[in-house]
């Protein structure tokens, strides 16, 4: 009797939990309502089977419970019952699978008017490419991939010269027009997913997979990787913005073509040196930094990282958060650089300065720091702690240990990295938070990592 009541309560509780639960699909913003329909059919069929089977089980437990003088009847076969069960099961399976076949046929049949764009997935970032005025994407291959050509576009293919490249994890699409996403992976298995679109597809190295959809609602939606791709899988986030046609045209016009990125003039180091004179008062003539002024060492950092941080200070991505008083002082300094060329010149000059390792100021448990670094940081910043453009991770070895500790604290507390225009900072917030502490003293943990970083000078 008790078991029958428990089974009955389990059924009622499961049904209530499902309908009262806040965990359900996001609102759909594409034309793929049919996918939701197929899922609903599967839910109702399996849900009905779950309820009926368990209620029948509860009934049997109660009805045929052991009683004095009752003896179970042995019936090895019941052909009539087996036939009915087989028939009902067959109908149920067909009812679940058949609609999916029709939806799949639509999924693999891309409309002729669909516009193509390319998604490049790599650990742990998203980049995007759009066809230029000719409406065609140029060919690409991994042999051409470099810091200046992260998509591996074939420089000999004229169709690729006007391709619009977006080396950032945010893409835009116009509303109401079908689009076909060509999916490439630069390293391991990834998966391109926007939950609100209802479609997803694996990205396999060496292959070009695809999916298509038609955006129906303007807004900003998360891009997720739903294929385990390494330690940074959980921070592989991006965004797709569905625009009006006017807003989309303005956005796409602001992005460079592949030809423009390859023809960019070399930075003027002399001009950068002249501009750096103001910075030298805090950061030192050789970029060696000054802890007394909370000015970190700059020499040794990559030019692309310096350029990004200067632009972040100029645009308010950094230095505007409450509690970031030192970052706030950099806002005015960065805005002395009048345009992108000035920022590039300054960044290139700083990157050209001799890299003299900073003197250690922090002591810590090097073995513990090495363990924490290897588990959390090495995948992006590399074993030698010199960083790489591939993962947009700056150099850490030979830099100021006190500044490293300060910035990890800032990431953990949300002072840095939470601005919507700082996707790599957002990744660092997640990684800094996820660094496994073996004790309750977070500062000691950071100092241990800093001490380990100091072992390579």
Please identify what each model-predicted range represents.
Residues 241-258, 340-358:
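Short, structured interface segments
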Residues 236, 290-297, 313-344, 350-353, ...:
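Axial heme c-ligation environment in periplasmic c-type cytochrome domains
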Residues 1-19, 48-55:
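Alpha-helical transmembrane segments of integral membrane proteins, especially early/N-terminal helices
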Residues 260-290, 302, 341, 361-386, ...:
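Sequence/structural segment immediately N-terminal to covalent heme-attachment motifs in c-type
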Residues 300-303, 309, 398-400, 407:
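Extracellular/lumenal glycan-associated surfaces
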Residues 215, 227, 273-283, 294-308, ...:
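Extended non-catalytic domains of envelope/secretory-pathway proteins
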Residues 15-39, 61-266:
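Non-transmembrane, membrane-proximal soluble domains of secreted or membrane proteins
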């Amino acid at each position: 009797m008790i078991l029958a009541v428990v089974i009955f309560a389990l059924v009622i509780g499961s049904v209530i939990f499902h309908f009262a639960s806040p965990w359900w699909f996001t609102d759909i913003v594409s034309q793929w309502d049919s996918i939701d329909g197929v899922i609903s059919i599967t839910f109702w069929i399996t849900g009905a089977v779950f309820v009926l089977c368990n209620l029948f089980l509860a009934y049997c437990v109660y009805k045929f419970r052991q009683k004095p003088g009752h003896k179970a009847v042995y019936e090895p076969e019941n052909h009539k019952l087996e036939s009915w069960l087989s028939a009902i099961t067959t109908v149920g399976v067909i009812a679940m699978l058949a609609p999916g076949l029709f939806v799949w046929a639509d999924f693999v049949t891309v409309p002729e008017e669909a516009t193509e764009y390319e998604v490049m997935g790599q650990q742990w970032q998203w980049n995007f490419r759009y066809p230029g005025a000719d409406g065609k994407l140029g060919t690409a291959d991994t042999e051409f991939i470099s810091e200046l050509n992260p998509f591996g576009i074939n420089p000999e293919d004229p169709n690729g010269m006007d391709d619009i490249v977006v080396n950032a994890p945010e893409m835009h699409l116009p509303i109401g027009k079908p689009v076909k996403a060509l999916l490439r992976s630069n390293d391991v298995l990834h998966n391109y997913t926007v939950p609100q679109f209802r479609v997803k597809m694996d990205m396999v190295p060496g292959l070009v997979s695809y999916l298509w959809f038609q955006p129906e609602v303007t807004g900003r939606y998360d891009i997720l990787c739903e294929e385990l791709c390494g330690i940074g899988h959980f921070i592989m986030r991006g965004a797709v913005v569905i625009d009006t046609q006017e807003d989309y045209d303005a956005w796409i016009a602001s992005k460079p073509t592949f030809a423009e990125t390859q023809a960019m003039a070399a930075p003027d180091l002399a001009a950068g040196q002249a501009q750096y004179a103001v910075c030298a008062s805090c950061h030192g003539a050789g970029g060696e930094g000054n802890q007394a002024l909370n000015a970190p060492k700059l020499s040794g950092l990559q030019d692309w990282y310096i350029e990004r941080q200067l632009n972040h200070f100029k645009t308010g991505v950094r230095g505007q958060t409450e509690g970031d008083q030192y970052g706030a002082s950099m806002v005015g300094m960065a805005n002395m650089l009048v345009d992108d060329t000035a920022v590039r010149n300054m960044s290139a000059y700083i990157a050209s300065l001799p890299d003299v390792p900073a003197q250690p100021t922090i002591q810590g448990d090097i073995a513990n720091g090495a363990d924490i670094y290897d588990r959390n940081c090495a995948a992006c910043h590399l074993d030698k702690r010199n960083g790489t453009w591939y993962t947009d991770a700056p150099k850490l070895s030979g830099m100021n240990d006190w500044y490293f500790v300060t910035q990890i604290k800032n990431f953990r507390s949300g002072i840095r990295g939470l601005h919507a225009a700082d996707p790599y900072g957002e990744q660092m917030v997640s990684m800094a938070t996820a660094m496994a502490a073996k004790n309750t003293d977070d500062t000691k943990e950071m100092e241990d990592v800093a001490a380990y970083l100091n072992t390579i000078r």
